[in-house]
Amino acid sequence: MAERPGPPGGAVSATAYPDTPAEFPPHLQAGAMRRRFWGVFNCLCAGSFGALAAASAKLAFGSEVSMGLCVLGIIVMASTNSLMWTFFSRGLSFSMSSAIASVTVTFSNILSSAFLGYVLYGECQEVLWWGGVFLILCGLTLIHRKLPPTWKPLPHKQQ
């Protein structure tokens, strides 16, 4: 059987194999959007459970807390911390990169901490704090954004 000639530079092109269907890019393959959704969902849950663990630790180790509330806070902190790590590891397995998962968990943790701080302790955040949250959100959208690939032609060798 004769071998088909390849393109210059040793790269494989789709025209060399006309019977083989072209594959979709990874972000358009079947189930990729579902995996991305579950990755983001698990990371958002991990951030929320992390904030809940921190809030329960603050309740448990407060200065005016009874012994029963302290024990309950430690139990809630340990269980929500283990749930946070479970959801984070699941989010890592579903995500396309660990950077996306880490930034998503961080953003979710910050917003959940602000919400729980307001509900449980009456804390209000300053404008500078919300500016930092906005910058984190901008970074998150830049990381999640999929830019089209830029293909550079291979330089031809001069003989």
From Swiss-Prot:
- What are the protein's UniProt keywords? Membrane, Transmembrane, Transmembrane helix
Chief subcellular location equals: membrane
User: What protein name is recorded for this chain?
Assistant: Transmembrane protein 42
Membrane-spanning segments:
37-57, 59-79, 100-120, 124-144
Topology in the lipid bilayer is annotated as: Multi-pass membrane protein
Question: May I have one GO cellular component term?
Answer: membrane
Which InterPro entries is this protein grouped with? TMEM42 (IPR039632)
| Recorded superkingdom | Eukaryota
Iron-sulfur recorded as keyword:
no
**Is Transferase set as a keyword in this record?**
no
User: What compartments host this protein?
Assistant: Membrane
